[in-house]
Amino acid sequence: KSLFPRNLISKHWDIYPDNFKKSLFNSDKIKNFRSNDLSFKFNDSLEKGMLLRTKRALEKLTKITGREFIEKNKETMIGNPKTFYIDNEYYDYHDLFIIYFYHSLVSFLSEKRDKEIFFVCEIGGGYGGLIHRIKKNFPGAVCLLFDLPEQNYISNYYLKQLNPKAKVLNLESLMSMKKTKSLDSMKIERDDLKKFDYVILPGYLIEKIHNSFIDIFINTRSFMEMNLETVYFYFSE
């Protein structure tokens, strides 16, 4: 975290105390992160009065996608989310929104399906719920996540729990692979990443992507939570 430029952390996300890693590295808390403070601010299900809101969200989403699409793409197990039993099935409010976002992207992702490998980059992906759907349905996608270190730790846990055999590249393994102890002159090339399923890195390293090879960039809502300097940084890259 000490490497992350302070000017790229907005007030909205400057919420983690110095001792937060004690909670983050607590095995019981990480197993239940979708029902505790570890997912604060990137999990709408933690809000109060969620039963009625979940019913309404399910009803609206069903009209858009159909119930079969929801059942195929929901994920209500990892992280012990706060679910509600509706119409003989369990649903998580935040999960329904992720399904909506995924449904909105399917047509764009399908355009890349014929490529053996294509690169999808999500900025501010939270615990990895959306990128999981993308990888599940489009196995040829190499999925990049750029976010704060705390979220990266949680998304790494979440995605590995869903797919223990997934090949994940993080900052430590990237530096080892590039045989460097310094980030200053590092360049991230297409060939560095093509053998991985997930690449999970701190947001500021997006500027190290060399000879832009990303096929699809995604940001669902976190740009509105960033300061203008941070938004400009991402758009300039």
Predicted ranges, named:
Residues K115-G126:
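Conserved class I S-adenosyl-L-methionine
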Residues E225-S236:
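A short, conserved alpha-helix within the catalytic core of class I
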Residues I218:
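A conserved beta-strand element that flanks and buttresses the S-adenosyl-L-methionine
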Residues Y127-F138:
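Conserved SAM-binding loop of SAM-dependent methyltransferases across substrates and taxa
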Residues S2-R113:
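Conserved Class I S-adenosyl-L-methionine-dependent methyltransferase catalytic core
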Residues V142-L148:
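Conserved SAM-binding motif I beta-strand of class I
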Residues F118, D197, I214-D215:
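Conserved acidic residues
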Residues Y158-H210:
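S-adenosyl-L-methionine
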